[in-house]
Amino acid sequence: MKVSTIPDHILDLPISGINLRANTLREELGNDPTLLVFVRHFGCIFCREMIADIAHAAETVPNYPSTLFFYQGTLEDGHEFFPRLWRKARAIADLPKTFYNAFGLERGSLLQMFGPEVWACGVRAAAKGHFIGLPVGDPWTMPGLFYVQANQILWQHDFKHAGDHPDFEHLPAQLATVQRTTSAMLVS
């Protein structure tokens, strides 16, 4: 497993958003393992589903990792959007996509946004009560999911398409294995 690092100049960037505890990404992360979630845009049915699924898992699964969202919008956009899905969500406003770009998130292809697998995932999200809304941010941006500790990226989910995301309720067990493996690699 490859362990990547978050560059210092990214960690030291000032942040603003909702329910934040610090002024830079480094301070916000501290040394605790954290799940970084980059949402596509607020109108995205899959982003709404992902936030709601993470909120449910965080409130019901023991030892769920601390979660920090990034979104392409203003502070006001975040204050309006997140309380509908998870009032306690911590989220960084990243309208210029500085953090999105730093973590290598790209724009999706036509197939990644509208392919057959995406439609099937849309049915899944709609069955959970989620629907498409007006985009806030670039609707072609792919989502991102990274498990980090301090400046180390321990794991990431490689999204195949806009509706692809892991089972958030079982994610802590997977991440615990990743963390043990990574710790052993760093010690040796």
Where are these regions (language model features)?
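Chalcogenol-based redox active-site neighborhoods
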Residues: M1-S188
